[in-house]
């Protein structure tokens, strides 16, 4: 198992309840595929450096996870399908 950092941005117009459900859904994808979510940091709404798809801000979420590459690949696939995710980045944590 490897350590990963997952940073994703949720559309700003998603309400708080739906946003929390979305975070839980993506955490569950990782745990269902044998990974563990060590830390979830909701960084809040932030302004973008440049406009993305006619949006100027988004809600940032950072996950620190331990998982197999297949679990992160499945998470990446599901996040790319979701209309509520503006951007995502999954990186190996080398610590």
From Swiss-Prot:
Pfam families: Ribosomal_S6 (PF01250)
InterPro entries reported for this sequence: Ribosomal_bS6, Ribosomal_bS6_sf, Ribosomal_S6_plastid/chlpt, Transl_elong_EF1B/ribsomal_bS6
Keywords from the UniProt entry: Ribonucleoprotein, Ribosomal protein, RNA-binding, rRNA-binding
Record-level Gene Ontology MF annotations: small ribosomal subunit rRNA binding; structural constituent of ribosome
Domain of life assignment: Bacteria
Any GO BP annotation: translation
UniProt GO cellular component terms: cytoplasm; ribonucleoprotein complex; ribosome
Family according to the record: Belongs to the bacterial ribosomal protein bS6 family.
NCBIfam families: S6
Function: Binds together with bS18 to 16S ribosomal RNA.
UniProt-recorded name of the protein: Small ribosomal subunit protein bS6
Biological source species: Exiguobacterium sibiricum (strain DSM 17290 / CCUG 55495 / CIP 109462 / JCM 13490 / 255-15)
Gene: rpsF
């Amino acid at each position: 198992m490897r350590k990963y950092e997952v940073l994703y941005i949720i559309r700003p117009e998603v309400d708080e309840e739906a946003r929390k459900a979305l975070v839980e859904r993506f955490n569950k994808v990782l745990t269902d595929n044998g990974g563990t979510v060590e830390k979830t940091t909701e960084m809040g709404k932030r302004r973008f450096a440049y406009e993305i798809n006619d949006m100027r801000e988004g809600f940032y979420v950072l996950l620190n996870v331990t998982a197999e590459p297949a679990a992160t690949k499945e998470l990446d696939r599901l996040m790319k399908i979701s209309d509520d995710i503006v951007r995502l980045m999954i990186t190996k944590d080398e610590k």
